Structure formats: C-alpha cells, structure tokens
Amino acid sequence: MTSVVVIGTQWGDEGKGKITDFLSQDAEVIARYQGGDNAGHTIVIDGKKFKLHLIPSGVFFPEKISVIGNGVVVNPKSLVKELEYLHTEGVSTENLRISDRAHVILPYHIKLDQLQEAAKGDNKIGTTNKGIGPAYMDKAARVGIRIADLLDKEIFASRLKTNLAEKNRLFSKMYESEELSFDEIFEEYYAYGQQIKQYVTDTSVILNDALDAGKRVLFEGAQGVMLDIDQGTYPFVTSSNPVAGGVTIGSGIGPSKINKVVGVCKAYTSRVGDGPFPTELFDEVGERIREVGHEYGTTTGRPRRVGWFDSVVMRHSRRVSGITNLSLNCIDVLSGLDTVKICVAYDLDGERIDYYPASLEQLKRCKPIYEELPGWEEDITGCRSLDELPENARNYVRRIGELVGIRISTFSVGPGREQTNILESVWSNI
C-alpha cells in the first residue's frame, strides 16, 4: 500500500498540476478528490502546454488509471469538451474512470452562482461563476443529482423537474431573472451523460483494490489549503476541502491509507479573487513578479494578486494537512531582484503572532514582519541540483525549509518537466 497526496499550500495556482504530472511517472493510479472545473492546471509535455480543468493530470500516461472521485462536482458539458480537446490533441482517455457518486453541475447551478455573486456587490467573494458552490449546496441539502442519476433517463427527468421548479421560482421571484427550460437542459445533459457513460464506475473500489494490491496511488488536490472551506480564509474560500483530509471523503479510502502528503508552493505567493492577503505587493516589484511569472488565472484569465512568500500561511497549511514533503516552485521568477523577502510572522496591534487568525477583522490589521535576504542576478532555469543554484538562491530555498519546518523534496526553476529537480523521492521509504 503506497499513496501520496499532492495539495496546494497557498491560494491555488501553486503548480500542483506540474508536480502531479511529474510524480505521476512513478504512480499507477492518479485521482482527483474535490473541486470541479473551477480548478485549472497546466502541464507542459515536450514543450507543449495542455490546460485541464477536470480530468486528472495522469491522463497523459495511457498505462495508468486516472480517477475523478466522488468528492468532485462534475459539469458534464465541460467534461465532454475537455475529452474532445484531448482527443483532438491525440491523447487517449481510455484510462479515465469517473465516480458514479460524484455530483453533477447543471445550468441552474451556474446561473445561481452568477446571480448570487452579483447580488453581493462590494461584498463579492470572487467566485469563478462555474456553479461549484451551488452544486455543493444541493449536495449538502440532499437534493443534488449524481452521475448515477444522470445516466438513468427516468430518474434524471424526475429529479431535474423537481429541482428546476424550485430554482426557477428562486430566479423569478427573488432575482427577477428569466427561468430556465426543462426540455433544453434535459435533452442536452442526458446526451452528455451517455457520452461519458463508458467511464463511469464505483471508483472507491478501484482505488482500494489498487492500494490493497500494493500499487502506487497519487491523489491530486485542486485549489489550496487557504481556500479550504474549513481551514481557509472563510468566506473567501471554495466550497470543498482541498486539505489532505479531504482525500478520505472525496475518494472513498480510509485515512490509514494515506502515507505521504506533498505540499506544493511557489517561492512567492499569489491568489485570484478577493480576500485577505497579508503579504500582497502593490508596487513595481509585484508587477514584475506578475509579468515574469505569467500570473494570470488558468480558469478565469484574471490577473493574480502577488506577494512575498508567507511562512505563516505555510505553517498553517503544514499543521492542518500533515504535510510531510514540500515542493517549491517558480524560484526562477525571483531572479534579478536585489532583495527577496520572507514573511516570518505578523504584527497584530503591536503583538507579534506566528499563527493565521480566523477573524477577517484581525487579518485586516495584520502587518507582515519580514526577513530580508540578498537576491540573485543569475538565470537559474538550467540548474538541475541545489548545488548548481547561486549561493543566494540556495540560501533562500534553505531558509524557506527552516521557517516552514518541512523538508523540501523537489524544487523547480521553470515550467518544464526537466526543470523539476528531485532532492528526495517521495515514493521512497513508504
């Protein structure tokens, strides 16, 4: 039994897709366990970029099984579009498996998401308007439609009719918006269900059988710990649990079957949308990092907010997810800066604190306490070991490991597979 979980430790966009793709080379099964097509990951293979939102990174390895677990909310329209995109690019999807227990995102979820966000005005959360939150709301309210229901024509029609009647009352009475058509949704989405039917199964059985057989299973998280609905910057969070504990609920395996947790982070910090961000930069340094790092959302295309590396955030992520290994990405983006900074603690009303407050009001008053280190001018994109890094870059990497309290197992100096460097194999000693 060998399993590794890959999670984002910041606010998403840390490069999980690339690290998952890299670790997938030694895995036999790769699974997603939460989120939906609000996630976006970019994989570079032989210099070519592939952008995925739902399908796990492991799909590029035809000999491995890729799983969309029960904790994922699936937009069938987006899924079919992504499958067609992969087929057009010559990528086989015969190795894909989709949980019959996963919940379905329907047009009324997307419309409700958009209307609710617009109604919030200045208090908007910064949702991607993909219907993720409303789909999870229906799941919690026990009125959601699952993949298994989508494949059964009579059950899908019955549940869709009931749900749509309720949602249309909401649209017309509360939001004074146009109602949606039952016939249009039913015909379109039942057809999508038939197109994905070949991939649908009980994925919990597949995952547990693989683990019991001693196979290497890799779990791929979406978003990041700071967007977790329980442990993140609530309410500026997603509607699921990206933390490592979400694996057990979202994939159908027991907690005793998780061996290692790899936390992925950037050498700086970024986030999309609204919410607290203590180390955010508003100056020319921030603009430089954004442009050099191509910090624009994979899903939304929105410019990401950027800031210095925050070890307070990282220690919080380590604690709530039990992170055993750290993967540090995008070190190359900081090349050329005279000085680099790491937030080591916060100043809250004159008191030094080293934890991340739950209160948004307290977070607004938190001022980052920085440790400054000398930067480096060298181009490090060709470095293939820690020793090859310039001394200042090497010291920066080591200091991050010390402050976070996690050993760094991989570091990357660019988007390519060959630019990801192993210091310690996470598959060893399990």
Swiss-Prot record:
It catalyses: IMP + L-aspartate + GTP = N(6)-(1,2-dicarboxyethyl)-AMP + GDP + phosphate + 2 H(+). Keywords: Cytoplasm, GTP-binding, Ligase, Magnesium, Metal-binding, Nucleotide-binding, Purine biosynthesis. It comes from the Bacteria. The active site is at D13, H41. Its EC number is 6.3.4.4. Plays an important role in the de novo pathway of purine nucleotide biosynthesis. Catalyzes the first committed step in the biosynthesis of AMP from IMP. This is Adenylosuccinate synthetase. It comes from Streptococcus thermophilus (strain ATCC BAA-250 / LMG 18311).
